[in-house]
Amino acid sequence: MRGVRPGRWVVVTAALASVAVPVCTSGHPPTGHPGHAARYDTGHPSRYAGQRGGGQRGGGPAPFALPVGHGGRLAPEPGHARPAALEAPTAGLLSNTTGAEGVAPALAADARYVQGSHVLRLASGRWMYLPDGKTASAVVVAGHPPARRQIERSRAWLASGRVPGTSTERRAAAERALLAMRALLRPNGAVAAGWSDGWKYSWPRDSSFVSAAFAHTGHDAEAYRILGYSAATQRADGTWEARTKLDGSGPPDARSAQLDANGWVPWATWQWYQEAPPATRRARLATLYPMIRKAADHAAASLRADGLPPASPDYWELTTATANIGTAAPLLAGLNAAADLAREANRPQDADRWTRAARRLSAGISTRFLPLGYQRTVDGRHGRDSAVAFMAPPFNEAPSGLAGALDTTYRELLLPNGGLTPGNDPGARWGAYAWTPSTAFFALAWAGTGRPEKAGRVLDWVLSKRNALGELSEKVDGKGRPSSVAPLAWTGSIAVLALVALEGTGLPTPPLGP
């Protein structure tokens, strides 16, 4: 573990239901906690390491920890005491589209958003909002004209695109998810994973999903802005850092790069291109094409003799000893996407090169992963992985054996609370907490493989776990309560994509090359 020296953990107890966040200040993570050490800037190489334990049991106060000196920006309503030494992950957001401020769980419990906005109606009836051009919230009388104008602009933005959903409940969830993603999007195109301090970084993976969700709901400018940020932060060798600071100045720590970004970013670009205005999309693709070429060439060059990529940290941000499906599947999607974009850009040599690489990778996946039911790794030692869903549309055309693998994986990862653990690797103890992104993957996969009823049931479970403000949280605890940071951009984007996929013609998938 880079930059981490033996030491001690600082853990305090807060009366915050369902929150467990161990954070390493200078040592190894303790066992038994499912919190978010990796998302804090502690030098730990894994996004999820230290999060895999059983969590708090028995309904008592949850252990909650922050790095020494860690400050927050959560704004309490007047009359609500703010914890002096620690803050909980956010439960919501105030936003003026250029700035954001987190809403504390204690405040969120008695407040509600004014519909279609990030203006908060407090228990007192007054409004709390983030004034334009400001970084601190204000509490004003209901109907305050500047706050009202902000509400009107927010609703106009929603109306400029579309809000997917076949029911009132689904549309309400989609609306809130879209607003949350807009609030987490920075003017430079960076997407904060969440708005608690440890989540205020931009992950290429999360950002790619958000870009695709914006593209498929008619918000072209936002989708393209995210892709522009990806182009600006791409490394010289064609890869990306695991995460960057929101100002684009670089990574906050020395964790290893993750090769899956070389699949996710071309895939997101391809999804944007399908929905972009035809009159301008080729010219705008030309601006992004150097990014695509570097990403796809690096991905193709990384493939070994067996057609698979090398071992790399997967979406768990944990390194495996052998190739994993969480890297191989996104790279296949990205190579197919890049090849199709090359054909659109009249670059036939690029298209042929990346198509050949995609065929090699597809053959390697069929040879090594298919016999194992698309388990996490090719050595068969690390169990089932929710990343099996990345082999399904809208990422890849469903290969042989995938339907059974999806069913088996879902069944083996299902928790008593109705959600999924990310995987059942014997070396990764996730405990009783379900992860909403991992669960929502299956809604998207089943929607894309012609099983809308199964997709709908899973999606409705995820949407039913929104918190009091209607935000989607990162986790759901063993008692079925939303837990950890909310809103989470990644979960929101997957939910929106699944809702789109369940409507009309569904979502497109990058084609296999000719």
Where are these predicted regions, by residue range?
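Structural helix-adjacent loops and short alpha-helical linkers that scaffold large soluble proteins
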Residues: 162-171, 215-227, 272-293, 339-359, ...
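Long, well-ordered core segments of solenoidal/helical folds
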Residues: 174-189, 219-241, 287-308, 355-373, ...
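Aromatic-rich carbohydrate-recognition surfaces in CAZymes
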Residues: 200-303, 328, 332, 485-504
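C-terminal capping/lid segments that line or modulate ligand- or cofactor-binding pockets
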Residues: 255-272, 380-400, 438-514
